[in-house]
Curated annotation (Swiss-Prot):
Residues 1-17 have a biased composition (Polar residues). Transmembrane segments: none annotated. The gene is AXDND1. May be essential for spermiogenesis and male fertility probably by regulating the manchette dynamics, spermatid head shaping and sperm flagellum assembly. Its main location: cytoplasm. This is Axonemal dynein light chain domain-containing protein 1. It comes from Macaca fascicularis (Crab-eating macaque). Residues 1-31 are annotated as: Disordered. GO terms for cellular component: cytoplasm. One of its GO terms (biological process) is manchette assembly. It is found in: Cytoplasm. The lineage of its organism: Eukaryota, Metazoa, Chordata, Craniata, Vertebrata. It holds the Pfam family Ax_dynein_light.
Length: 855
């Protein structure tokens, strides 16, 4: 606490007479101190006091001694510690006593300046135990509050202390209970100055030496009144003061009182030192011991308070932990109840599942027994049916062999030689047909696997070729961008006014080097469209085309083997032609992109010549005296090159718009998808074709057997000797005519089907067996032409069966029946085979027919 400052006018009046001082002191002694008023009625210090109030204050020397710290202004720069120079005259509030002019005497009274009065709140009192600055309605920063629960706010005298968020600290003691010490007053550094000393506290203020003028009893009485008044005022203020806690109020009172005692004690020491320096020094020592004792008490209080705060914190933390523990116990209890309920539910479900499982096991055992019984019954039934089938097959074989033997005997007895031959021809035709169908199926399977392998290899090569072309185009695009960027940079540099100044040097050298470098890069890219790189690309494209032709030929071979009976190719052939058409478009687009026909081959040489022209112009220009027309021509040429570069960048990776083509990526993906669908269709066509061939063969086989049986029944006479019973001639003749007519119609229809099927199968397998024979002959296979002979045998057996049918029908009808024309025979057999088979067969057929007609 500081007393009100006195006006500056009476402090600076050093020339006032001693008589005026005595009168003022006497008057003040009789009147005493005036009553202190409220703070709002305090006299304004910035204005000089009225004359009527000058005599109402304490003596000047006492007042100056009491308030010299309050009136001490900031330390001038020339009095700061690093600068030890004299204080200019005329800046001090009063003259210094002569005792301070002598170093020895000043050293004797050094205790007066060792413990100055500080008004910055840094006195050595016990108020630093609780560093808090409190004003009505708010608590300043670093406020220390008593322990409180973390989840609530406490209110003390209308002050709400907010809860700060927790932070990581380097101590276990909570931040709200830290003890913050005030900055104490440092010791004075006494300079060898005759008038001043420097108070090195927190503000480095200038401190005047205490007055050493003699004191009277009136001054002591006046000092007593001042102390009482100050204590009274402190009591009044303390009653008005309300802090957050009682500790705040107690410390506030202690601080106020200790400040007053410190100030009064300092003045007493000064007054005693005037009369007796030794007594003053003794009082100073007593004061120092007293301060040390208070300091020790304060430290003990600090320790006690720390223990108290720590205990409170521990209690608070223990309470919080207990609360948390209780909360956790409640949560665990709740979870335990839920777990128990869930456990009960699971137990019930488990018991139910166990019962269901036991019931299911019982049912399974019953079902297993039932299944076992059914299995035994099925086994018995199967064995019985197998035995029956074996018996039936044995009976069938017996009857078949008996029928065959009887038929042979009948044929031999009745001399039906052609019927036996007809049976053998049908049996041979069936054998060769089955073998060729198996060969055809195996060949189709091999070709389909090879076709899938070749198409996959072709797709891989196309993808690789596409990647190479795109990498080349990307490299070309990067080169064009570099050239365009460089041209733009130099054009902008040429447009600047300072670029051609002599101070910048000759910039043409750098430009010419860049132009030549760009010209070299573009020449390399030009070689890619005309040199060995182009030939390499064409060779790769030829390999791709050759591979595509290979799998195309394999596909055509499969289609030729699977024509319809009418000779029409399957629909997959048209689909393949569409694929080939799109592939040709793809090849054409790739050729345009690799040889530069999309515009590169025309624009790139022009661009290179333009760069060469600009380089030549720049080499011949004289720096810096360059005509404006030359610059305009170069600038126009650069603009032209930039347009050409933009056009080339737009043409990269595409073909001109006037060519009706899709994008390469889209077209290529479309082709790959078509090939995949085409392979699936070919696989389905092969399976369906082989199944259809087998079905037609089975139908023809049954039809041929049925026709032969009908022929035998019709040809064998009803009796062969006189012992047989006679039938009615009319019924026999009518039935014979109907049977002959039906036999003729069936023979004509069967002949057409057999001729068409045999010709179709032989034409489908002829190329296949020829290739197989050539392949086997190259490996020196012993039976290289066996499959080829089987095709000829198939046709021969077909022709002989048809020819035998024709002879038999001719003999039965009594007129010549022709089932095949000469042209059809030539189509079925080759010319040489026709000559070999037709004439002998005709003679033999005539002889056989004569034998059949003989009785």
């Amino acid at each position: 606490m500081s007393l009100p400052k006195t006006p500056s006018t009476p402090l600076n009046s050093a020339s006032t007479s001693e008589s005026k001082k005595l009168v003022s002191v006497a008057t003040e002694g009789t009147r005493g101190l005036p009553e202190l008023k409220e703070k709002k009625n305090m006299v304004d210090r910035s204005k000089p006091l009225p004359t009527s109030l000058l005599n109402e204050f304490i003596p000047k020397e006492v007042l100056l001694s009491l308030t010299y710290a309050a009136n001490a202004g900031p330390c001038p720069e020339n009095l700061l510690p690093p600068k030890k120079i004299k204080t200019p005259k005329g800046t001090l509030p009063r003259l210094v006593d002569h005792v301070w002019h002598h170093p020895v005497r000043r050293n004797k009274f050094k205790y007066l300046i060792d413990h100055p009065v500080s008004l910055t709140g840094a006195g050595r009192d016990i108020s630093f135990l609780y560093d808090v600055k409190y004003t009505k309605g708010q608590t300043r920063e670093k406020a220390v509050c008593p322990p409180h629960l973390a989840r609530s706010l406490q209110s003390h005298d209308g002050v709400i202390v907010p809860h700060k968020p927790k932070t990581l600290t380097d101590t276990l003691i909570p931040e709200e209970f830290h003890i913050v010490s005030s900055t104490g007053v440092s010791g004075l550094e006494c300079y060898d100055d005759k008038y001043t000393t420097l108070l090195t506290d927190s503000e480095n203020r200038l401190l005047l030496f205490p007055s050493m003028k003699p004191n009277k009893r009136v001054e002591v009485a006046q000092l007593n009144d001042v102390m009482d008044t100050m204590l009274e005022r402190a009591g009044v203020e303390n009653q008005e003061y309300t802090g957050p806690t009682k500790m705040h109020k107690l410390l506030h009172i202690l601080k106020k009182e200790q400040t007053i005692y410190n100030t009064i004690f300092h003045e007493l020491i000064r007054q005693v030192s005037v009369d007796c320096a030794d007594r003053g020094e003794l009082l100073s020592k007593v004061r120092e011991r007293y301060v040390q004792m208070l300091d020790q008490i304060a430290r003990q209080m600090i320790d006690f308070y720390k223990d108290l705060v720590t205990q409170r914190v521990m209690d608070q933390r223990i309470l919080e932990e207990l609360y948390n523990f209780k909360h956790v116990i409640e949560e665990l209890t709740r979870e335990l109840c839920l777990v128990r309920a869930h456990d009960v539910k699971l137990t019930k479900e488990t018991e139910k599942a166990h019962k269901d499982l036991a019931q299911a096991l019982l049912d399974a055992e019953k079902n297993a027994k039932m299944v076992e019984e059914y299995h035994d019954l099925y086994t018995l039934q199967r064995e019985r049916m197998e035995n029956d089938m074996k018996q039936l097959m044995a009976e069938r074989d017996i009857w078949s062999s008996a029928t065959y033997e009887l038929a042979l005997k009948v044929i031999e007895r009745n001399r039906v030689i052609l019927a036996r031959r007809l049976y053998l021809n049908e049996k041979g035709w069936n054998k060769y047909t089955k073998h060729l169908i198996i060969l055809l199926a195996n060949k189709d399977t091999e070709d389909l696997a090879l076709l899938q392998k070749l198409t996959q290899k072709w797709r891989n090569l196309v993808n690789k070729f596409k990647q190479e072309v795109e990498e080349m185009e990307e490299s070309t695009r990067e080169t064009l961008k570099i050239v365009e960027k460089g041209l733009t940079k130099w054009q902008e540099s040429f447009n600047e006014k300072d670029i051609l100044s002599p101070n910048n040097g000759n910039v043409f050298d750098s430009v010419i080097l860049d132009f030549k470098q760009w010209q070299k890069m573009l020449n390399e890219k030009k070689e890619e469209f005309t040199g060995d790189v182009l030939l390499s690309k064409y060779d790769t494209l030829k390999i791709i085309k050759h591979l595509q032709e290979n799998w195309t030929d394999i596909g055509l071979g499969i289609f030729n083997r699977h024509k319809s009976l009418e000779g029409e190719l399957p629909s997959e052939r048209q689909y393949m032609e569409e694929i080939i058409k799109n592939i040709q478009k793809l090849y054409k687009e790739y050729e345009i992109r690799i040889n530069g026909d999309n515009g590169y081959s025309k624009i790139l040489p022009i661009l290179i010549s333009s760069l060469d022209f600009c380089s030549f112009k720049l080499e011949n220009l004289e720096f810096p005296d360059t005509p404006l027309e030359e610059w305009q021509e170069i600038d126009e040429k650069i603009n032209e090159m930039k347009l050409q570069l933009d056009l080339l960048l737009n043409l990269t990776g595409i073909v001109p718009q006037h060519i009706d083509m899709d994008s390469v990526s889209v077209l290529q993906a479309y082709i790959f998808n078509m090939i995949q669908q085409w392979l699936l269709k070919i696989g389905n066509e092969i399976n369906n074709g082989n199944i259809e061939l087998q079905r037609h063969m089975d139908e023809l086989h049954i039809s041929m057997i049925q026709w032969m049986v009908n022929l035998l029944i019709l040809m064998i006479p009803n009796f062969t000797d006189q012992d047989c019973l006679l039938k009615l001639e009319e019924e026999s003749a009518e039935k014979h005519d109907i049977g002959v007519a039906r036999l003729e119609l069936d023979a004509i229809e069967l002949t057409r089907k057999l001729y068409q099927y045999s010709r179709y199968l032989s034409s489908s397998c002829e190329g296949m067996v020829t290739a197989m024979a050539l392949s086997k002959s190259t490996t020196s296979h012993r039976n290289a032409t066996e499959d080829l002979y089987e095709v000829d045998k198939l046709k021969k057996e077909c022709y002989e069966w048809i020819n035998t049918c024709s002879c038999l029908l001719s003999n039965i009808k009594g007129r010549k029946i022709t089932l095949l024309t000469y042209e059809e025979i030539e189509q079925l057999l080759e010319e040489e085979a026709v000559k070999e088979f037709i004439e002998p067969e005709m003679d033999e057929s005539l002889l056989c027919s004569r034998r059949i007609l003989l009785p």
